């Protein structure tokens, strides 16, 4: 019993410490940052799904979309030449050194590809949806390189909440007036992504 009581107290202390740290890390505005979810459908078919960092997360989103009967194509190395008749670009953010290696591209090359693709999409009036669905496992130096540039150009964002415990994506969306829906897991994508399409 004593051991159990000590464990509970140590966990409670860790919980308090984490809460204090998040307040210190977030600064003055982050704790007050409010972001609304998507109020009405903004996207149109067909969609082009690509990776932002070459993790396999984009393939999981494609599987969900296929099961929902959504009209889309996937291309993990898409450039402006691949936009075709796409009316929506979905960029699934998550860095993977293994995925980058398999694609024959480094992080800087991936950032340049995404910048070129997203600028072309913006110029063509294509709706951009940023997704971060890998949770906490898809955070860290590599993945974080891709989050800011992708979210800054997005029209809408979907985030698995465990991947945004520091509020980075929420803050980016608030700063850019981008609607963002937080979900508990990748399986919850079905409750928000199809509803984004007209």
Task: Describe each model-derived feature in a short phrase.
Residues 160, 179-185:
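Short acidic-hydrophobic, aromatic-tinged amphipathic segments that line or gate anion-handling sites
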Residues 9-13:
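C-terminal motif of bacterial Sec signal peptides marking the signal peptidase cleavage site
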Residues 101-125, 172-180:
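A short, gly/pro- and small-residue-rich
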Residues 17-40:
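N-terminal, intrinsically disordered, polar/charged segments of Gram-positive cell-envelope systems
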Residues 65-85:
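A short, well-structured beta->alpha microelement
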Residues 42-67:
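Short, charged N-terminal beta->alpha structural module
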Residues 140-171:
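Structural recognition of alpha->loop->beta junctions
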């Amino acid at each position: 019993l004593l051991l159990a009581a000590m464990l509970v107290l140590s966990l409670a202390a860790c919980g308090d410490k984490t809460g204090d740290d998040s307040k210190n890390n977030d600064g003055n505005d982050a704790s007050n940052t409010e972001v609304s979810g998507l109020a009405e459908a903004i996207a149109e078919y067909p969609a082009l799904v690509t990776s932002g960092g070459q993790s396999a997360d984009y393939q999981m989103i494609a599987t969900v979309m296929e099961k929902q009967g959504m009209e889309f194509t996937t291309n993990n190395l898409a450039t402006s030449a691949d936009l075709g008749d796409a009316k929506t670009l979905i960029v699934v953010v998550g860095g993977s050194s293994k995925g980058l290696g398999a694609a024959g591209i480094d992080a800087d090359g991936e950032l340049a590809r995404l910048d070129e693709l997203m600028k072309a999409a913006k110029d063509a009036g294509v709706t951009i949806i940023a997704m971060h669905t890998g949770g906490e496992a898809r955070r860290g130096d590599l993945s974080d390189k891709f989050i800011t540039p992708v979210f800054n150009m997005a029209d809408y964002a979907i985030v698995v909440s465990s991947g945004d415990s520091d509020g980075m994506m929420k803050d980016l969306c608030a700063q850019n007036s981008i609607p963002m829906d937080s979900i508990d897991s990748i399986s919850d994508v079905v409750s928000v992504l199809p509803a984004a399409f007209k």
